[in-house]
Amino acid sequence: MDKYARFRYQPCLPLGVDGRKVTGSPEHAELSRRAAGEGMVLLKNEGATLPLKRGTRVALFGKATVEYIKGGGGSGDVFCAYTHNIYDGFKLKEDEGKVSVFKPTAEFYKEYVKEAGKRIPTRAQIEKIWDRVNAMSFCKEKDDIIYDTFASMHVAEAHMPDELIAEAAANADIAIITLSRFSAEGVDRKAIPGDYYLSDTEKSLIDRVTVAFPNTVIVLNSGAVVDCEYFAENEKVGAIIFGWQGGLEGGTATADIICGDVNPSGRLADTIPVSYDAYQNAQEFLTGFEHLDYFDDIYVGYRYFETVPGAAEKVRYPFGFGLSYTDFEFSGAFCGESDGKIVAAVTVRNVGKVPGKEVVELYYSAPQGKLGKPARELAAFKKTKLLSPGESESLALSFDISDMASFDDLGKIKKSAFVLEKGAYSFHLGASVRATEKLKYEFVLNDDIIIKESKSLCRPTKLEKRLLSDGSFESLPTGEPVRNRGTHAEIEAKAPAETVKFDEVGETITLDEFIKQFTVDELIDFVGGHQNQPGVCNTGAFGGMKRLNVPPLPTADGPAGLRLNASTGVPTTAWPCATLLACTWNTELIEEIGAAGGAELRENNLGVWLAPAMNIHRNPLCGRNFEYFSEDPLLAGKCCAADVRGIQSQKIAASVKHFACNNRESNRFECDSRVSERALREIYLRGFEICVREADPWTIMSSYNLINGSHTSVSYELLTELLRNEWGFKGAVTTDWGVHSSHSDEVLAGNDIKMGDGEPEELKAAFESGKITRADLETSVKRILELTLKVAE
């Protein structure tokens, strides 16, 4: 059997110990549970409400007690063998003798969900709805239908009878209320009760339970930020846990934390404000349809809340915040300069009574200068090992001085250049953006320094203004877009005299010589996806050509685990959502998960994992925020790079997505993200750049949306001049599935593969008219073949 056999023959080849499968294995489930426990964030713990003392009697409330949301919908959904909900987790703790569960409340919800579930649309009914939706042009009505359809797939919160609450209070010591939210690809959330805000039924439940019980714990089971104001300061709510979406073991991991088997060490990857309206872009996100004006510019998330006057008071829980069951002490903090880097060190000591982990966060403050800067920007971070009481660990952090440079897109100092402005740069080290101490060392420049000269790329032409650090706005130049495109050099090689198969590339023939054997029609077919891949593949494949024995590369979703159709009968591991993983601040753990997920793809004869996803949490209502890591590009980029390293250690290609500015789902195929070059460089592209430079992803997926008037999949400036020429990306670029742009324009831009299907007739016409050349096609084909060689190693 040749080395490409796994792409041609589809039986699962177990990769585990003793011939066992790793896909959906107990070992992977345990890893998922461990990760979930490390990323859940303890937001409140008054009077040491948690962990529960052994023998505590608990009563469980909220329909999410049994209808636990393991992850979001769409490409991020995962078919797994089971999902352990909150009730399951506490029954396990009861079996272990740690708590006593008052079962009637949980059984009430179990029966309610069962009965209400009968009214949930069947698969056939949902398919009819999608047929109707797909036939419509995008409009608000279509958006509402999609939203209502997803909402109908989960039951509403139940009204718990007062009598049952009273009975529970008489038989339990503490109440645990779990509130859940679901979101999905294709539609955004809404700033309404039952979504971003609590519903009246949820408020009533909290009111009645907190009156009946002396103490209450609230667990939030959501992939993105929800409003916490209704209960944050309620004195009867002793503890709050943001549990995110914890994958197939999320309920068990929640019980682990509440019962003290795991000490929470998650820290927020997003700011949680006092209301949705606290976001600078709140109304613009709700009303924008054909375009979104990114007038908040670089002031996204904590960069806005910690900088702009009056915004700080709008924060409930700051970026990087999270509590522990123990206390930590920082000592011996040092900061200085060495070999073009800022270096810092600190010793962290556990001064509490139980083992725990702490996150050390290093921020810098740059001089405002002519360009204006956020008050704080995350520069580096590290997480300690599990420290026993009294144990210490010394951590070293560093980052390049050039990382503090700002992009001057208007020429205030040097146009289209990264600039370090003169003045004093200070450094702040601590456990959240607000819980820091200013270090003694300052990096001082007497003159402005040009770090790197670039060029104007993806320039906005219709964004009229942007926010400044003092809360005012500056006008931006407008005009007509100018789109650049280049030419691809012809491959200098000759085809062999006789046909040579792909198996011999690198042995008897070079890759360039091999490509010269392709006919034009074969080149055209090769740069488009196809859906006839056998086996468990359900998102199609690309590449593959029987005549020359080139194997296809089967693809698979998605960011929260290998997504296979239930009809395959192959349950996989549902990992915690990306936001939870970012809240671990543990890149080693994320890399371990990437490797485990990559092994599941390899075992099932797949080649490309359409993950991880890495767009910025600009607004909490984006329907796919659960797929993305953070509001901060450094944290997102480091998490993404770790995931990619893990995935590709298994010889599976990671496909980092969605490149770029895919920050909303409504009208996602045609919505234009109007954003300044500076915000693009410093916020929305920064995480991708970190991943490219640190992890060398083998593929990147362009997004559906437009950036400043151009679909990303046809943007030569984005895909070639910036991604390849500036960052040095060597891999292949694929479109997202069904993007609304011309295949020939994509080839010219440097987008190598059109998925899920190509447009061979359009490409052939473009070739015959001279719009594209054989050299253009060969360039993309070569990148696909180089990818194939990497995956097949």
What are the residue ranges of the model-derived segments?
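Extracellular and select intracellular beta-sandwich modules with Ser/Thr-enriched
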Residues: 436-441
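Glycoside hydrolase catalytic-domain context in secreted enzymes
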Residues: 1-435, 451-793
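Short beta-strand edge segments in extracellular beta-sheet folds
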Residues: 442-452
